[in-house]
Design a protein with these regions (language model features):
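A glycine-rich, hydrophobic loop/mini-helix early in the fold
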Residues: 13-54
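Broad gene-expression machinery/nucleic-acid interaction feature
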Residues: 41-43, 85, 94, 114-118
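Contiguous, small/hydrophobic- and glycine-enriched helical/loop subdomains that border
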Residues: 41-88
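A generic local secondary-structure boundary/capping motif
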Residues: 13-15, 32-34, 97-109
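Short acidic-glycine loop/turn motifs at beta-strand connectors
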Residues: 38, 91-92, 123
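Beta-rich nucleic-acid/ligand-interaction surfaces
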Residues: 81-104
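Single conserved hydrophobic/aromatic residue that forms the stacking wall/gate
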Residues: 1-9
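Long, positively charged amphipathic alpha-helical accessory segments at protein N-termini or as interdomain linkers
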Residues: 60-62, 66-79, 101-178
Length: 178
């Protein structure tokens, strides 16, 4: 999945991705490219009136939207933190990334904020490095030596099946909304 402004040919090895059976799609939010395999990722989206983030910086709105997730992941035993503007990471690497778009009010409507997150439940790191072009700058920002070590999937840390992780995250999200 490529962000709205990304150059697909710079961010992905398009021919390799197609040979591996991937379809490259573009989302309407910013951020980088995401490597998504069905069953190996967990995603969620929030859609709220723009007033939800009124008076907040972009960074504050990311933290508000993902606070419940960070707490839920900690309850699963993961040592997670916010990393930069849009990443959720452990001491070993990136666990997930968020992106956001704000829609201005139109036709008398309130405007909206779209926020979504992709989490690595499990990952084929070697395949990811073949499909994505991850820059040296990105690696140095993350203080890791290889793209394969850049991502830290939760399966190896929790020992839980994906369905159990999803169920616990849903329970945490429901508790926050009540």
């Amino acid at each position: 999945v490529s962000s709205t402004a990304s150059d697909v040919y710079k961010r992905q090895n398009v021919h390799t991705a197609q040979d591996e059976g991937f379809h490259i799609v573009r989302r309407c939010t910013g951020g980088g490219a995401m490597f998504i395999e069905p069953g190996n990722t967990i995603t969620y989206s929030l859609y709220a009136p723009l007033d939800f983030a009124h008076g907040m910086s972009v960074e504050e709105s990311y933290e508000l939207c993902d606070y419940w997730l960070v707490e839920a992941l900690r309850a699963l035993g993961l040592n997670v933190r916010f990393a930069g503007l849009n990443d959720i990471a452990t001491q070993y690497g990136k666990l997930g990334g968020a992106a956001q778009r704000r829609f201005a009010p139109t036709h008398g409507g309130p405007g909206a904020i779209l926020h979504h997150v992709t989490l690595a439940y499990d990952i084929d790191a070697e395949k990811m490095t073949r499909v994505l072009n991850i820059s040296r700058e990105k690696m140095s920002d993350k203080a890791v030596k290889s793209a394969a070590k850049h991502v830290d999937p939760m399966r190896s840390q929790t020992g839980m099946g994906r369905d159990e992780v999803v169920a616990r995250l849903v329970d945490a999200a429901v508790r926050v909304t009540m």
